[in-house]
């Protein structure tokens, strides 16, 4: 009985995937935007503007630091960088 219970617990853990994965919108070229699961450890979604135009979206470990003429918006919910 204990073996059966242990087997069921292991199967449940594998099926549920207890590791949570953030989903963010990604955009690397004009008109090409999708939602994807972020790599492990990248739990921040960001949106990057340059001179007022959105030029990229994606996942990050920390909110990126803007360079000249760049602005970043970062958030912590799934697909919050729409």
Swiss-Prot record:
Tell me the disulfide pairings in this chain. Answer: 24-45, 38-59, 63-74, 75-80
Tissue and organ distribution: Expressed by the venom gland.
Q: Which CDD domains match?
A: TFP_snake_toxin (cd00206)
Signal sequence segment: 1-21
Q: Where in the cell is it found?
A: Secreted
What InterPro entries does the record tag this protein with? Answer: Snake_3FTx, Snake_toxin-like_sf, Snake_toxin_con_site, Toxin_cobra-type
- Record-annotated membrane-spanning stretches: none
- Which GO MF terms does the UniProt record name? acetylcholine receptor inhibitor activity; ion channel regulator activity; toxin activity
Where on the tree of life does the source sit, at the highest rank?
A: Eukaryota
UniProt keywords (A-Z) are: Acetylcholine receptor inhibiting toxin, Disulfide bond, Ion channel impairing toxin, Neurotoxin, Postsynaptic neurotoxin, Secreted, Signal, Toxin
* GO CC terms in record: extracellular region
Q: For this UniProt entry, what is the primary localization, expressed as one broad class?
A: secreted
Q: What does this protein do?
A: Snake venom neurotoxin that blocks neuromuscular transmission, presenting a postsynaptic action through the nicotinic acetylcholine receptor (nAChR). Has no cytotoxic activity.
Similarity comment: Belongs to the three-finger toxin family. Short-chain subfamily.
Q: What is this protein called?
A: Mipartoxin-4
The protein's organism comes out as Micrurus mipartitus (Red-tailed coral snake)
